């Protein structure tokens, strides 16, 4: 059987107007039009749930210990087990949730992941895309120091997620915003022997982060029992 899986960091549905004139209904309509069988979304407020999408089953998890943001796994198929991955019993700074989903007579486990953000400022992104020779030393130090701290956080999160995945009784599909590149430790640790849907059936460079063109930080990975036939990244700007 064929199932359609969609992963999207909706950036709290543009609640603070980062993208001028973009209304949350536009994002809803896009998700509704895509009509995925399994939808994983990151970064949204609970009040902005999307019941009009008519997904019968969902799992909503709080995104971090302190954050008011949440993430969710919506599906057209029954979810029989839902939980949050923890580190030594504690929630991560960011979150990984999972649902066990019955599709016909088979059960799969779907993980939705959002690893630690780099917390770059707009000035950091500007420097990355437009390096200033006169200020390059200070700017590089600022960017590198942030990356060192969050790189370590993502590594710890990735280790916990991989440990949890190793004990899954079902074949897995992993969706999410890793905030890191395919060369990173976090990506490689989580991926393990899974296949990458972009690598298997995508085209182009697969960039997924508007602020740094050509950067891929969002992924759909899957067990080798599955096959990716049509990876697609829409060229729309409804989030970052």
Model features per residue range: what roles?
Residues 7-22, 119-150:
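Acidic/histidine-rich helix-loop elements
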Residues 8, 42, 113, 176-177:
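Active-site flanking residues adjacent to catalytic metal/cofactor-binding acidic residues
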Residues 12-16, 45-49, 65-68, 93, ...:
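Active-site environment of divalent metal-dependent phosphoester hydrolases
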Residues 144-170:
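A long, amphipathic alpha-helix that forms part
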């Amino acid at each position: 059987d064929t199932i359609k899986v969609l992963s999207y960091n909706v950036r709290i549905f543009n609640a603070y107007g980062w993208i001028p004139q973009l209304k949350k209904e536009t994002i809803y309509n896009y998700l509704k039009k895509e009509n995925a069988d399994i939808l994983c979304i990151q970064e949204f407020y609970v009040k902005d749930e999307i019941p009009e999408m008519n997904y019968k089953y969902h799992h909503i998890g709080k995104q971090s210990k302190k954050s008011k943001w949440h993430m969710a796994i919506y599906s057209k198929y029954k979810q029989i087990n839902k939980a949050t991955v923890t580190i030594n019993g504690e929630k991560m700074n960011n979150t990984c949730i999972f649902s066990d989903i019955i599709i016909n007579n088979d059960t799969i486990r779907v993980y939705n992941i959002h690893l630690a953000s780099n917390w770059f400022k707009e000035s950091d992104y500007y420097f990355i895309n437009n390096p200033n020779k006169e200020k390059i030393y200070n700017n590089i130090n600022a960017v590198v120091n942030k990356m060192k701290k969050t790189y370590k956080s993502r590594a710890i999160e990735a280790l916990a997620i991989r440990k949890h995945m190793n004990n899954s009784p079902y074949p897995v599909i992993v969706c999410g915003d890793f905030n890191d590149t395919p060369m990173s430790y976090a990506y490689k640790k989580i991926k393990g022997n899974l296949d990458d849907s972009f690598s298997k059936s995508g085209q182009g460079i697969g960039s997924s982060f508007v602020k740094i063109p050509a950067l891929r930080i969002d992924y759909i990975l899957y067990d080798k029992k599955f096959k990716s036939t049509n990876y697609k990244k829409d060229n729309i700007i409804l989030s970052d």
